[in-house]
Amino acid sequence: MSSALSIGIKKVRFPAFFVICYLLSAISAMRSWLALFLIPSIATAEWKVVDRQELNAGSSQAFVITVSDGSAIAKIHAAIGHPPELRFRVLNNGDRRFSNVREAVSKSEALAGVNGGYFQPDLTPVGLLISQGKVIHPLERAKLLSGVFFVRKQKPALVRAQHFSDTTGISDAIQCGPFLVENGNRISGLNNRRSAPRTFVFLARGGHWGAGICRSATLAELSEILIIADLLPNGPVVSALNLDGGSSTGFYLARGDQSISSPEWTTVRSYLLLSPSVQPQ
């Protein structure tokens, strides 16, 4: 009796064991399926404009744009205009005479401004810096410093650092990086782990140039945000270069009694200002 009972129990246990293994295998397969199909669809959710505020500032326009991918929200502050009505210039702040971007814009009689390029703790510039035709710091070869924004004969331009060599006729320049948008396309391989305030300079379709900040996004997210087709009424962004970010990120625009302000948290070495061009008498 005991032997028969023992054998009977064994016959029941073995099928149960296999059923459990089968269920565990099925659950594992289902997890793999979810990872394959659902997670990528969440990760690649498209960013869309959910709110836009505009301010006409004479020869330029300013925007405060809120975007979302369904799970995260970022806010863009940007000023944009069309040269030659709008002039870009780099303001050197090596003597610390300006404590913030608002002061730099106001005292320079500019329309708008953002912080400029990278710098050391003692405010020594990192990368090429040219202000008012004077080379403050020379070009550097470094992976991070992949682009140069410069102005020659009041015409702004953005190029890869390896394609830049001649400073003749350049009035203003900032070397920084990485590129965020190139030829209307996002840049692959950008960091997608660290979210922080960002500053950038950009070219939009139709020859419109601008500068702005984003609070707050990873470099990869900002690259995706800047190629949103209806981000700007002037047309999509064609090219964009990342400037110094984090605590340096600051934006200010004033038009009469109206202003848009998102201040930085530290003293910076340089500013990129947008000013009305001097009209001939």
Feature map (PLM): residue ranges:
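Positively charged N-terminal leader segments that act as targeting/secretion signals
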Residues: 7-17
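Sec-dependent signal peptide recognition
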Residues: 13, 30-36
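Short polybasic linear motifs
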Residues: 23-24
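N-terminal signal peptide c-region/cleavage motif recognized by signal peptidases
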Residues: 40-42
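Zymogen propeptides
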Residues: 44-140, 212
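Short acidic-glycine loop/turn motifs at beta-strand connectors
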Residues: 69, 83, 150-155, 182-183, ...
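Active-site-adjacent helix-turn-beta-strand microarchitecture at beta-sheet edges
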Residues: 119-192
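Conserved, well-ordered active-site substructure
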Residues: 123-143, 191-242, 247-281
